C-alpha cells in the first residue's frame, strides 16, 4: 500500500501562511505557487485575479476569507499550503487550519512588524504547538525596517526570533538578501519576475555587518542548543550543517523562530523562505503523535503510518461550484482509497467517499488514494460537518473536535419575494454547514430570520454570498447585539399545568430549584425521591426547560449559565403526559424569573486601538464615552497602543469615528472576551425595545 506514495512522509510539509490583514499573505502564497511551477501567470491581489482568493467576495475586497488549500512542490518535497484569513472576523478559519497543520509561516509587514491580529494568530499557533518561521515581507515599502520587525517579535510576542538573513538595502533600494549561513548574497533580476537571481559573494560594503550578524546568529543558536554552546565556548569550528540541524531542533521544540526577509510583490526572497520551510518546519513524522480516544475513552496515539487503520479529521466544508459539497480532510494515520466507506465516529454513521481530490486554490486533480499526512478534498460525505472524526469502520476513534466561538452580532434578513424565501432557506443551510460560527434561526414571535456571526464584515460577506452564489435578494436589518440573560439569585419555583376539558385532561406539576452557574452553561439535576414525578417524565422536564430558556424571561434572549434541580412535584395517573410536564417546567421557569434576579448580559470586546500620540486624548475620551474600561497602554513605533474592554453595543460605527478623529491614521481590532451584566438603565431600554417584562 505504502509504495504508491509520490512523496515520502519525511518530504511532506503541511504548512499554513498566517498574518495580520494586508501583511501580504495571499501574495506570498501566489509567489510560492509561481516558483514551484503551479501557475504560469502571477496573480495580484490588488488586481483581483489572485489564484488563492477564489471567491468573488475575496476578489472584490482583496482579502482572504476561506482558507484555500493547495499543493506545491519544492526541492523534491511536497508542500501542502493553507492560506488563512488575517481578519479577526474569520478567526474560526485560522483555528481550523492550525488544527491540521504541522508548521506555519508567519508573514509580517516590514513597516508595521507585529500587529494585533498577528498576536491573535500567534497565540492560537502557540495553543496548538505549531512550529513557525517568519517572513518579513514588503521590504520594498517606504518605512520598511527589518530590525524593527525582528525586535517586535521579541517584545510583543516574547518570541525567540533568530534572523538567518539580512536584507540588502530597504524600501526602493531593496535588492536581495544575504544568507548568514553560507555568507553569500542572493541578488534578484527585476525583469525575470524573481524566478532568476544571482548568488554572489557578499558585497564589500555589507561584509562587516554581515559578519557581526552571523556571529550574533550563532550565539543565539548556541543559547538554545547545548552541543553548539559547548563548541562555541570552546572556540571550535561549527559547520553550517550542525548549525542548521540545531536550529531545526529548536524550531520544532518552539524554542526558536527563524526569520527571513523579502518582498513577495517584488518577487524577492520567497525561494529562500521556501528553503526555510523545507529546512526548519516539521514533516508529519516530526510532530508529536496526535491523541485520539477509542469507544471506551482510552487515549490512542495516531502515528503517521500508512499501514495503520485510517483516521482523519474533517476540518472544513465548502460548496464548490463544480463538484458540490466538498469536505477538506487531514489524514493523521492510515490510507484511504476513493470509493471506500468510512465511519463518521462523531455521528456514528457510515459514509462513502466518492472521489478524492487534491486541491489547488479552486482547481483540482482527482487522486486514487490519500495517505497519512495528506490534506485532500473528499466528495460524497453528506452528513459530515466541521470537526467530525472519520475513521476505519472497524476501529472507531474520536479525534478532539474544534473549539467553536459563539457568534456576537446579529442582523435580520428579509427575503424580497416568496421565491427568494425558498432559495434563502437552502442558502442558509449550506452556509451554516460551511461555517460553524455563522448561525441562522427564526424568531418564533416575529417570524423573522436572524443571522448571527463574528462581526459586521463576517455578516456582510455571508449576505453577499447568498446574493451571488444562491441568487437571493434580501433586505438586511440593522446589526443587533447577541445579548444573553441569566439568573443571579438562587430561587425555587413551582410550575403546575392542569387542564380539564372533557375526556382526558392534562396534568403536570414540578418544583425546581434554580441557581446561578456562571461560565458553566445549563445543567439539569434530577433529585426526585420516591417517584413523585415518574421516571419517564423527567427528560420532558429537562427538555421543557431547555426550550423555554431559548427565549429568556426578560427580553426574549437566550438564558444561560443556570443550574436547574428538579426536587419535587406530583402527577395524575390518567391525565399526566410528557407534553404536560414540558409545559409545567416552562411555567416553573417563568415563575422563578421575578425572584431570581434575572439580568441581561452583554458581550464585552477586547479592543486595541493604535493611533499617533497627538490623538491620544481624543481616542481615550471616545473609549470612555463608549463605557470602555482602560486596560493599559504601550508605545509602538511612534504610535500609542491602547488596550480596553468595551461593550459590543457601543462599538457600532466606531471605525468611522476613529478615522475622522485621527485623520485616518488610527486603526483598531476587537475580539470577543466575555459576557457581563448590563447597567440597569441600559437593561431597561433593551427590555422596553423588545417589549419584554421588566
From Swiss-Prot:
GTP binds at residues 19-26, 83-87, 137-140. The keyword Flavoprotein does not apply. Residues 10-285 form the tr-type G domain. Keywords: Cytoplasm, Elongation factor, GTP-binding, Nucleotide-binding, Protein biosynthesis. It comes from the Bacteria. GO terms for molecular function: GTP binding; GTPase activity; translation elongation factor activity. Its main location: cytoplasm. It is found in: Cytoplasm. Belongs to the TRAFAC class translation factor GTPase superfamily. Classic translation factor GTPase family. EF-G/EF-2 subfamily. This is Elongation factor G. It comes from Lactobacillus delbrueckii subsp. bulgaricus (strain ATCC BAA-365 / Lb-18). The lineage of its organism: Bacteria, Bacillati, Bacillota, Bacilli, Lactobacillales. The gene is fusA.
